[in-house]
């Protein structure tokens, strides 16, 4: 079920909230929790019921392993078993085809590559539960009930595409009985943020995607301006799409009196690649830092080890996003940029902020081309067209995408908006239920509903 669908907005969400707070108002807190677990599982199964059993099996397995680890007897063995099973599960569904293709290409074999449908949200709920097992090994978990653990993994705002949540932040909120009672301030903030996110997805991201897809589909026929329009367009599309989902997830959490972690903090305002990764997909960055980079040694064993750990971490982030060499290259590119950024800081030379911003934004945009491209040939051809300065003058007949001139200027205008407008999450810190917010919410909601004639997936559903 999509957040940007009529059945979610007008059926699922009102029913879930009404029954949840009904049981809360009657002080039937166990009933309220059970209802939220069941409705979240239904939310997951509505998309494809075939993988509900897989989700439940994963939850049961990780909960049992977590309890075994908490007993402190042979906890290292149980941790290894738990992490190995999680990695194998994710590897089977996400990377089997990719690895078999590499074997066929390298060994000259002709193995039949099976068509394996990627279960929705598997990367997210696998990372969430793996972090839980590691925290149990560190002695940071406290024997939560199975129902509470189920809610932690399945609560519907975050289940499909994050943000990645952590037990120490979320489970105390689930156990707080006051959160089962309706809070009208949270409900108002949640509705406002949900409307803004819905607007960003339907009105901005989905409209940008039309001409971005057309440009990438005609990658071998692009001129200078079209190539730049495609690169800029996808840079904006991905941000508006993914940040919209994250903001809608946070908004839904607010309606349930839950504070989900912020995933974006105006990343395209970053003045360095280091700064960018502190602002982009923040919960993934936290996960990689806490459960991969630091355990590998972090920056504790000299500069070379620090650079190596950074690069390996970014390669894994790339592979986590998708089973393809373009994703690995994208991760490696960011790893290299981070290494350069850290070494530049050691020189003590400070560049003017406009130059820092321009270098950062251009590097990120260039890397996104590999992230979006289906293969290296497509990515390299688009980049070649971007730097084919002999083709700057374009005849109108050569434009492959409808209204390209308008789209280029729209992209530039969007860039200005991204630079100067505050993050919606930051804006909500000053939220007051007044006519201004009522107007923003109503206008954003009405425009979004008017344009919501087709349902489009969020880009991060594929990861």
Residue locations for each model-derived region?
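Membrane-embedded transmembrane alpha-helical bundles that form the catalytic cores
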Residues: 1-414, 423, 427-462
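Substrate/cofactor-recognition hotspot
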Residues: 417
